[in-house]
Structure formats: C-alpha cells, structure tokens
C-alpha cells in the first residue's frame, strides 16, 4: 500500500427574474389535524417503537409492509375527513418512455419560459454559472455570497469576480448600515413575491443569500448559510480564520482555500437549495439525503437498513482497544453510517458528522487510486471549533473505514488498527457477502406502489431513513418543494401538547402529486403519492391506513433501520 495522501491545512435587487409561486398557489392546500377531527384520539400514547396493541404475526414478516388487516388506529373516528382528490385533467399528465410522470420545472414557477425544456430551464435559472454575463447572473433563482467584514470577496455561487465585487460592496454597505443606524445585525429583508435576502454575520465572515424561491423559509436559508460556514470552519478552524483576520482586516481568505474547496462550496449550494447534484459523481439520493439532514430535518442524519445481528457483528470487528482512536465510523459505499463507536463522554453531533461525510466523499472521489489511505486534520465546528481532530480513512471493498483521533502524531497507530480491522473483515468473507447483499436491496421495494417516496424520522435518535428517489430526472426537486410546503403548512396549524401524544397530520396537493405528513412526539413521517390515470381519487382513510402500515413497519424494524448500538 502506498503512503497515504495528506491534506495540509494552514495553521442587487430583484431585477427581471421568474417569480416562484407562493405556497398557497400549489392548488387548494388542505390541512387536517386530529385536534379538529371528530374525535381527538386522546387515548393513543403507545411506546415510541412498539404498536399500542399486539400485532398479528402474519401481518408483518419483518420485510413486507403490505397488510391484509383492517383499518388501523389512525383511521378510527376520522369519518369526516374529505377525500383526497387530484383535480387534474388526465390529458395534462404526460408520461416518459418508462411510463413515469414527466416533471417540468416550469410547472413550479410563474415564468414566461413555460415552453423551456427541463435542461434549458435548469441551465438558465438554476445551474451554477461563473461567467461575465450580467443578464445570466440576474436570471439565477438563488445566490450565495461569502465575504469578509471588510468587504473582501471569499466565494460566490454565481458570477465572475467583476460582477461579484460590485454586489458584495452593496451588501457590505447594507450590513454596515444596519449595524450603525439600527444598532442591530441584519438578519432578513423580505421584499415581496418570495424574494428575500438572508444574512448571517459570523465576524470576520459574513454570509448572505438572495433567494427568489417562495417555498423556502427564512429558517431554511439560515440553515443553508450555517452549513456553508461550517464547511469553512471544518477545513480551516475558527482559530486559523481569526488569526489571519486579526493580522490583517482585509485579508483574502481565498489564498488558503484550494480549488477543491470552491468545488465543494458549489456542490453544497446546489445540494442545499435544490437537492440536485452539481457533479456526475454524486447521485440524486445522496444529495437529497444531504438536503434532508441539513435543511428539511435539520441536525438529523440518514441511516441505512441492515440486520441488527449483522450490525452487532460489524461493531465487534471495528471496535479497537487503541487508546488513540477516539471515534470509529464504518460507512456503506453510498456514504451512510453503518456503525458509529464513540466513548461515553464524547460524541460527534449529527451536524459535524454530516459535514465530515461530505468532505470525505469529496476527497475519495478525487483519489487517483482506491488503495490509498487518507490522513487529514478536520475541525468539527460543534464539537470544538478551535481545534482539529485527525481522520484516517481507508476503503475496503465497497466500505469506508474512518478512525478519528485527537492526536496529530497517531497516524502509525491508526494505520495499525485499520490493518487489524481489515484483516478481520477479510477473514469474515461470508459476513461481507451478506452485508453487500443487504445493502443492495433498495428500501423502495418494501413500500406500497402508491407511494413514490417516504421519509421516516425517529425523533429520539434524530435519525431518518427514506426510500430511493424515482429515476426520472429532477424528481428530487419536485419532492423537495412538496416536503417544504408540507412543513410550512404543518407549522401553521399544529399545536404541540407536552402532556398528550396527539397524532398530527396534514396534506397538500401539487398538480399530479399529493404530499402527506403524519407525526407525534416519537416520529415524523412524510410521503408523496402520485396520481395515476387509472386512480383519480385516494380517500383520506386509505392514505392514512397505508401510511400507518409503513410507520408500524419502521417501528417493528427499528433495530435494523437505525444505529442504536
């Protein structure tokens, strides 16, 4: 094995743009809570992981969600709920070559370019462009700017330096005016028609986003800006950034950022806004997972389904007595955590773990050879934003092993531990085959065909699982938009009661899809169904019934779906 790679980290206005539709314009948004139903379901206080009543052994086989039993507890006393009906002319629904619905960006926006193809629309309004064309710059629906308190540019999602410098000068003036004239920090300017300017001041760094996407909330844009800031802290640390700006206020931070860092910032901007990959090496599922963990379900992390006994055996294999190893993480080939070992007194927050996985993925994709180890210092912003942890990374078959230490001199010790772990894995080929087989089974095959996608989050663990996205292009954006509007609708009508475990539900319709949300204090469940020409009406009872079956299945398979050991 060759010596590992080493990453050395040194100690204007709205203009003429297409306006997005408001949330209320997605068709008649209907929200129903159990508080307003005919009976309030006050008696449902089941345990967080087990059904409140015994489940017949034939109803669930540990794999299948489909049930032949009658109506579930969620349906009782909901006779007054209206039918969920897709009021769309069947001729307006187009199908692609595979029979799936053809998504069009122009259906989501009020724009004169309704005849643009998806790719043309994406290129004109969404894709990242660093050119000098000011009209092209103004067309973009989303902008991110990062600059110093002195107005020195650090990063821009779109535009060349000539264009960006002028905008950053204006934004610096606006931020300074708020500080001087109002004695407060600029946080958000809402200018109508969905246009908003959101700012986060992390002196000596200022991050600003200009969003023309009406479905985005101020909170979600704040989370996006915070993620970009965490990336900078992750590769540099707060101490290094402060040191440079303390020495010179107008320091150009771009001097210590690599080309890969700017590529990663581009990737993050597109992922966190649209759930769409910027490069071909990332899949829709991975980018949508990043969006979900950082924005839709903030501070959560995605898990992957494997048998509990298999996860336990992997735990015993990757567990090491090496005192230099602080954290051990085993990843699947698609970047999801299979095993995570940490000492009782220390734990990496999900926010840091998600950023760690993103950075490691970006480094691995740029490796010249897969048999090379990586050794790099990274700062974990929430864990400790002033220091570094040292990460050893090795790929074994389709898995990724990460050993993390607090000592910069622990490379040899961590490499020795990695050798021992890989030897154990090589001696357990039968286990490796079982693992690869289980990871190859998509979660979507266990979901009723009526569902196009679902997300299930365990609130106590702050972990979620979701089914795979449909393969047709840009479907992730349509789902992302629907889920966001679901959350906004839910937030307006749901009243939380800490003493009672009320179930809460809401749904909305957006052209040919219906989004549905069901939650209590133990879980959050989101799903999307798609209207077919053969089935124009889905009753509320039927939708809740199938959703409850998926929820029960997730609870029954809790140990398989989530990292609990």
Curated annotation (Swiss-Prot):
Chain spans, region Disordered: 1-37
A biological-process GO annotation: autophagy
The keyword Protein transport is assigned to this record: yes
Gene Ontology CC terms, in alphabetical order: fungal-type vacuole membrane; Mon1-Ccz1 complex; multivesicular body membrane
Transmembrane segments: none
Keyword annotations from UniProtKB, A to Z: Autophagy, Endosome, Membrane, Protein transport, Transport, Vacuole
Protein location: Endosome, Multivesicular body membrane; Prevacuolar compartment membrane; Vacuole membrane
Keyword tRNA-binding: no
Compositional bias per record (Polar residues), positions renumbered to this chain: 16-37
Organism domain of life: Eukaryota
Membrane topology designation: Peripheral membrane protein
InterPro entries xref list: FUZ/MON1/HPS1_longin_1, FUZ/MON1/HPS1_longin_2, FUZ/MON1/HPS1_longin_3, Mon1
Function per UniProt: In complex with CCZ1, is required for multiple vacuole delivery pathways including the cytoplasm to vacuole transport (Cvt), autophagy, pexophagy and endocytosis. The MON1-CCZ1 complex acts at the fusion of vesicles with the vacuole, through its regulation of the SNARE complex during the coordinated priming and docking stages of fusion, and particularly at the stage of tethering/docking.
Protein family membership: Belongs to the MON1/SAND family.
Protein's name according to its UniProt entry: Vacuolar fusion protein MON1
Organism: Candida albicans (strain SC5314 / ATCC MYA-2876) (Yeast)
Protein encoded by which gene: MON1
